[in-house]
């Protein structure tokens, strides 16, 4: 089995979290987060991440309502994924991200209390949860 390097994005209109993982181990770790202006990232930062890590696949979290229906942010996350593919030619997978932020907050709080709950840490941790959930769904 070939080990693929996979980047995951937790898309948001104000901030985007990023994680990196290896498919063969099914593990991920937080990389970074960066600000977005109304959902538009600094594309130079995105390009730098993609060229540095050279992922075989990019997973973008898809924000859905608890009943699985789409919300306004869902279309924006899809648009972000389409732009990633269009600009950089990377393979894209969309993955349900319901409750990833809640889980990330709980994990971070457990490890470091309120001090660990800064926005960037939460977004990057959410990207880890999205990617690990995607790994689990593949098996």
Swiss-Prot record:
GO CC terms of this entry: cytosol
Any GO BP: rRNA 5'-end processing
Endpoints of the signal sequence: none
Gene Ontology MF terms in the entry: nuclease activity
Compartment annotation: Cytoplasm
Pfam families: RuvX
UniProt-listed InterPro entries: RNaseH-like_sf (IPR012337), YqgF (IPR005227), YqgF/RNaseH-like_dom (IPR006641), YqgF/RNaseH-like_dom_sf (IPR037027)
Swiss-Prot/TrEMBL keywords: Cytoplasm, Hydrolase, Nuclease, Ribosome biogenesis
Chief location: cytoplasm
The protein's Enzyme Commission number: 3.1.-.-
Record function comment: Could be a nuclease involved in processing of the 5'-end of pre-16S rRNA.
Family: Belongs to the YqgF nuclease family.
Protein name: Putative pre-16S rRNA nuclease
Gene that this sequence comes from: yqgF
């Amino acid at each position: 089995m070939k080990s693929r390097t996979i980047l995951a994005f937790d898309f948001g209109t104000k901030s985007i979290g990023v994680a990196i993982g290896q498919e063969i181990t099914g593990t991920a770790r937080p990389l970074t987060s960066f600000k977005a202006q109304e959902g538009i990232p600094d594309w130079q930062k995105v390009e730098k991440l993609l060229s540095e890590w050279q992922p075989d696949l990019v997973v973008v979290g898809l924000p859905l309502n608890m009943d699985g229906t789409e919300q306004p942010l869902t279309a924006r996350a899809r648009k972000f994924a389409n732009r990633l593919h269009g600009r950089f030619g990377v393979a894209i997978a969309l993955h349900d991200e319901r409750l990833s932020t809640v889980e990330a907050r709980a994990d971070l709080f457990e490890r470091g209390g309120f001090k660990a709950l800064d926005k960037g840490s939460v977004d990057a941790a959410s990207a880890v949860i999205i990617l690990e959930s995607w790994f689990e769904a593949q098996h």
